[in-house]
């Protein structure tokens, strides 16, 4: 029963962390810099405060979003490469 209660606490902390991250992202803008700032702040707080499961795994785990940052990076590089290739092909076509 204690593991269930701890799991629910971690879930509640994660939900709270996600809400705070969303509010900050809406306020600061949805780009790489706010996400990077949130992740660095979350990692700093995790190391400095050494929080329990609710605040650490839950809140700070939901607050940080390393996977979303990686997805943004991969998407940026993929679409940049595809966009550059398509732009080059279009320019090459026009030159003929």
Swiss-Prot record:
Keywords (A to Z) from UniProt: Cell membrane, Ion channel, Ion transport, Membrane, Metal-binding, Sodium, Transmembrane, Transmembrane helix, Transport
InterPro entries in the cross-refs: FluC
Membrane topology: Multi-pass membrane protein
Gene Ontology MF terms: fluoride channel activity; metal ion binding
Binding site for Na(+): 61, 64
Signal peptide: none
Activation and inhibition: Na(+) is not transported, but it plays an essential structural role and its presence is essential for fluoride channel function.
Subcellular location: Cell membrane
Pfam families linked to this entry: CRCB (PF02537)
Substrates-to-products reaction catalysed: fluoride(in) = fluoride(out)
Gene Ontology BP terms: cellular detoxification of fluoride
Keyword Cell membrane applies: yes
Membrane-crossing residue ranges in chain numbering: 4-24, 26-46, 69-89
Superkingdom of the organism of origin: Bacteria
GO cellular component terms given for this protein: plasma membrane
Reported function: Fluoride-specific ion channel. Important for reducing fluoride concentration in the cell, thus reducing its toxicity.
Cross-referenced NCBIfam families: PRK00134.1
Family from the record: Belongs to the fluoride channel Fluc/FEX (TC 1.A.43) family.
HAMAP family referenced in this protein's UniProt entry, alphabetically: FluC
The protein's name in its UniProt record: Fluoride-specific ion channel FluC 1
Lineage of source species: Bacteria, Bacillati, Actinomycetota, Actinomycetes, Mycobacteriales
